């Protein structure tokens, strides 16, 4: 997605959610400064084992789709969206790439990163404290912003961790992207909300609107991108 196209989406998102663009850009500036000092990965630095990608979201279908994936006998590039990383590690699946705004179960994201997963860290107006806390614990980081990219930061398109992961796969040259654990419904899991006591719970209105945007953005990519999207 071209930046100018994304910015039209972004303007609507700011209006619908009441987000502060200046806060987004403050967090982005912090992430950029950290990466300039500690190492600035680019897209070309990511080795992908296959042009067939699978993106795991943290929806209710995640566990069943993980079992389906493990039964496959084909190489795929595996991307986990934030909290889905925990479920992958529970099934002994190490993602190649993690896309996160640092509100999943961080000990699992840190462990997967330690084992070799590249972490694509997203800056937005609500996660500056998390950036300060967790960036020093991570390595092999690519930075993203939801505003105008600059310095070490990219903007591939996408709003939530899940659809950003899909847009990242497209930017990495995917020919096929399988969507797994991406339900876009009214139920969330403990992988999406680590503070939740039960396995499943209702999505609040903000979460439902975020998932609606995620679904619409992926639909846009399917219509306009040069990639085949397969929904499990």
UniProtKB/Swiss-Prot annotation:
GO terms for molecular function: 2-amino-4-hydroxy-6-hydroxymethyldihydropteridine diphosphokinase activity; ATP binding; kinase activity; magnesium ion binding; thiamine diphosphokinase activity. It is an enzyme of class 2 (transferase). Transmembrane segments: none annotated. Keywords: ATP-binding, Kinase, Magnesium, Nucleotide-binding, Transferase. It catalyses: 6-hydroxymethyl-7,8-dihydropterin + ATP = (7,8-dihydropterin-6-yl)methyl diphosphate + AMP + H(+). InterPro entries: HMPDK_MptE, MptE-like, TPK_catalytic_sf. Its cofactor is Mg(2+). Pathway: Cofactor biosynthesis; 5,6,7,8-tetrahydromethanopterin biosynthesis. Its EC number is 2.7.6.3. Pfam families: MptE-like (PF01973). One of its GO terms (biological process) is thiamine diphosphate biosynthetic process. Catalyzes the transfer of diphosphate from ATP to 6-hydroxymethyl-7,8-dihydropterin (6-HMD), leading to 6-hydroxymethyl-7,8-dihydropterin diphosphate (6-HMDP). HAMAP family: HMPDK_arch. Belongs to the archaeal 6-HMPDK family. This is 6-hydroxymethyl-7,8-dihydropterin pyrophosphokinase.
